[in-house]
Curated annotation (Swiss-Prot):
Reported function: Catalyzes the last two sequential reactions in the de novo biosynthetic pathway for UDP-N-acetylglucosamine (UDP-GlcNAc). The C-terminal domain catalyzes the transfer of acetyl group from acetyl coenzyme A to glucosamine-1-phosphate (GlcN-1-P) to produce N-acetylglucosamine-1-phosphate (GlcNAc-1-P), which is converted into UDP-GlcNAc by the transfer of uridine 5-monophosphate (from uridine 5-triphosphate), a reaction catalyzed by the N-terminal domain.
Domain of life: Bacteria
Alphabetized UniProt keyword annotations: Acyltransferase, Cell shape, Cell wall biogenesis/degradation, Cytoplasm, Magnesium, Metal-binding, Multifunctional enzyme, Nucleotidyltransferase, Peptidoglycan synthesis, Repeat, Transferase
Gene from which this protein is expressed: glmU
Catalytic reaction(s) noted: alpha-D-glucosamine 1-phosphate + acetyl-CoA = N-acetyl-alpha-D-glucosamine 1-phosphate + CoA + H(+); N-acetyl-alpha-D-glucosamine 1-phosphate + UTP + H(+) = UDP-N-acetyl-alpha-D-glucosamine + diphosphate
Biological source species: Streptococcus agalactiae serotype III (strain NEM316)
This protein's name: Bifunctional protein GlmU
Amino acid sequence: MSNYAIILAAGKGTRMKSDLPKVMHKVSGITMLEHVFRSVQAIEPSKIVTVIGHKAELVRDVLGDKSEFVMQTEQLGTGHAVMMAEEELATSKGHTLVIAGDTPLITGESLKNLIGFHVNHKNVATILTADAANPFGYGRIIRNSDDEVTKIVEQKDANDFEQQVKEINTGTYVFDNQSLFEALKDINTNNAQGEYYLTDVIGIFKEAGKKVGAYKLRDFDESLGVNDRVALATAEKVMRHRIARQHMVNGVTVVNPDSAYIDIDVEIGEESVIEPNVTLKGQTKIGKGTLLTNGSYLVDAQVGNDVTITNSMVEESIISDGVTVGPYAHIRPGTSLAKGVHIGNFVEVKGSQIGENTKAGHLTYIGNAEVGCDVNFGAGTITVNYDGQNKFKTEIGSNVFIGSNSTLIAPLEIGDNALTAAGSTITDNVPIDSIAIGRGRQVNKEGYANKKPHHPSQK
């Protein structure tokens, strides 16, 4: 039989105190909704229906055509939300997973096990449960003397005995699809919240003598529902440890997982070393044998093998094998560093292509430039690429020596094997094999210094 999934993503998330819908808040680089969607793929659903409401278009844009969508205009409870999927699913035969879009830590493995348990036990409904050290706020799983599930009681409706129960409802279920939509016709709002509880269908099934079961998670963390910024930070911490552990299993050294911030889609090759306080975001990819030292921050960067990045920032750039960057360098979007390039301390490179074995050791700005191989930038070199309105390009050939404190005013071309004298302001193109000198001639005025206040004769 087919599997289906309903993802509940209509809520505003008032306690988040945010303009964003709750499920749009990110954990380790992607939205909570995307985490849930990825995990749901493990059950190989024939159809996924996402229930949307608050700022629906934002939520719809995240999943695009990978899901069907239904609107819940009024948020009248979880049961009401599932009712919205009736037109999409009610006549289908199979098993339907119902899961909240704010549970980013649930794993695909657990959902697959839940479906398997449901099918093997021939249940009409199976509840995903967990044991909570502090169950306050959760619905409680009430069992009879034969350990069978009899009902789920919400916190506000629980009596003193029921509030002592540690087994909680995670808010994730599997149902026989047609039985689910039949039972939803019989639920009402006679409860403390005045809402349609999805949990009420469990009681309906029990009264009808249908089989209801519960599959208990081994790891309570997976059950975490994010309702506020505190829980969001908790989810982030758990996910970070999970991600770091997987990289370590794959052969990466993560010196201190507590301080490594690695987004879920980041790729890292074997034998690479991630020192403390490193942040790797977005679609960053790191090759083999690369060292990222304390404080490095990479966003959507493509980094090759045997690279060393020392306490530097790299954004949306390509760094080839054997490159060294930093300390305190900034590689800005649109930059490409070829093999063997060295970008040293306090160097900024923006929107530039730098050829093999070129070196900019210190205190340099290279912007909107195309640079050949084996070029040396002296300290203090500046490409002047902006006139206040437009950006201009600097083109530098191969085997060029740029003297210290050179100012290169674009648009400008410097030919192969050329040299600029230290302290020069270069405004015109420099031909191949030429030396360009663009500075005032030094004049020494002998004896003038003894008239100045600093001179010993004046003290």
